[in-house]
């Protein structure tokens, strides 16, 4: 506080009015008191704007009590007050920006953790038969028919025929729209046989296991598809 007072005093003494006021104090000239505007009015304005009443006490002690004849112009310290207020606002703005970045990073990490947990659950599921193969493919979109065709390496016509025959399943439910969008964790089945006596059906299954962030040079999505060429499942009664 003492160092700040000295620096402030040194700065204001560079003004001509300050030296005139000081000369009046040394000579004891009463008229020197009328050289400048009243400090009380300015200090009230300054403390109100900055919301810091202690500034009024500080400047009053320095100039009014110790040097009563040194009546300086309020403009001598006004820039100091403005810079102080600006620095406070800048610090608050920086803190808010850092907080926003931290929140965005936290949301991305949470999303990544959810995806990892979902993949681990699929790996540990005891009901999933392990006679599968993981394939890295590239798809133009995440439409059901596009993903199934790519994963099973079959033609588009075969997918359409199976759809109209009611042989396509999405998450073990009958597919009603072949343009449905699929996501990570969805299973796509093509019915290839059934055993009415045993109450089972055989399907070719595709599981959308993973989607990479980077696309191919032709702007296709890079994915990992898990394929079962023959998977026997309990037959479910499908709604018409």
Curated annotation (Swiss-Prot):
At the top level of its lineage, which domain of life is listed?
Answer: Eukaryota
Recorded GO molecular functions are: ribosomal large subunit binding; RNA binding; tRNA binding
Q: What is its main location?
A: mitochondrion
Where would you find this protein in the cell? Answer: Mitochondrion matrix
Task: Indicate yes or no for the key word Phosphoprotein.
Answer: yes
List the GO terms this entry assigns under cellular component, sorted alphabetically.
mitochondrial matrix; mitochondrion
Show the transit peptide stretch.
Answer: 1-84
Q: What is the effect of changing residue 149 to A?
A: Decreased RNA-binding. Does not rescue diminished mitochondrial transcription induced by EtBr
The regions listed as transmembrane in this protein's record are none
- Which controlled-vocabulary keywords does the entry list? Mitochondrion, Phosphoprotein, RNA-binding, Transcription, Transcription regulation, Transit peptide
Q: Region Disordered: which residues?
A: 95-127
Q: Tell me what turns on expression of this protein.
A: Up-regulated upon depletion of mitochondrial nucleic acids.
Question: What are the recorded Gene Ontology BP terms?
Answer: regulation of mitochondrial transcription; rescue of stalled ribosome
S4 RNA-binding domain residues are: 142-217
Q: Where is the composition biased (Acidic residues)?
A: 116-126
Phosphoserine modification, residue list: 106, 116
The role this protein plays is: Mitochondrial RNA-binding protein involved in mitochondrial transcription regulation. Functions as a protective factor to maintain proper mitochondrial RNA level during stress. Acts at the transcription level and its protective function depends on its RNA binding ability. Part of a mitoribosome-associated quality control pathway that prevents aberrant translation by responding to interruptions during elongation. As heterodimer with MTRF, ejects the unfinished nascent chain and peptidyl transfer RNA (tRNA), respectively, from stalled ribosomes.
User: PANTHER family given for it?
Assistant: MITOCHONDRIAL TRANSCRIPTION RESCUE FACTOR 1 (PTHR13633:SF3)
Spell out the subunit comment: Monomer. Interacts with POLRMT. Interacts (via S4 domain) with MTRFR (via C-terminus). Associates with mitoribosomal S39 large subunit, peptidyl tRNA and nascent chain.
Q: What is this protein called?
A: Mitochondrial transcription rescue factor 1
User: To which species is this protein native?
Assistant: Homo sapiens (Human)
Where is the organism placed in the taxonomic lineage, from the top? Eukaryota, Metazoa, Chordata, Craniata, Vertebrata
């Amino acid at each position: 506080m003492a160092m700040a007072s000295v620096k402030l005093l040194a700065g204001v003494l560079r003004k001509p009015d300050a030296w005139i006021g000081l000369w009046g104090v040394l000579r004891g000239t009463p008229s020197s008191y009328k050289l400048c505007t009243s400090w009380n009015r300015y200090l009230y304005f300054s403390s109100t704007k900055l919301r810091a009443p202690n500034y009024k006490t500080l400047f009053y002690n320095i100039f009014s009590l110790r040097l009563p004849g040194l009546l300086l112009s309020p403009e001598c310290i006004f820039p100091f007050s403005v810079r102080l207020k600006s620095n406070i606002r800048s610090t608050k703005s920086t803190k808010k920006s850092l907080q926003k970045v931290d929140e965005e990073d936290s949301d991305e990490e949470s999303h990544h953790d959810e995806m990892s947990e979902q993949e681990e659950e699929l790996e540990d599921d005891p009901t999933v038969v392990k006679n599968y193969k993981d394939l890295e493919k590239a798809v133009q979109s995440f439409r059901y028919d596009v993903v199934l065709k790519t994963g099973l390496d079959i033609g588009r016509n075969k997918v359409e025929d199976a759809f109209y025959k009611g042989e396509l399943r999405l998450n073990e439910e009958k597919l009603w729209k072949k343009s449905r969008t699929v996501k990570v964790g969805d299973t796509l089945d093509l019915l290839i046989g059934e055993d009415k006596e045993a109450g089972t059906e055989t399907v070719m299954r595709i599981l959308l296991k993973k989607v990479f962030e980077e696309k191919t040079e032709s702007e296709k999505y890079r994915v990992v598809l898990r394929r079962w060429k023959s998977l026997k499942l309990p037959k479910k009664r499908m709604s018409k």
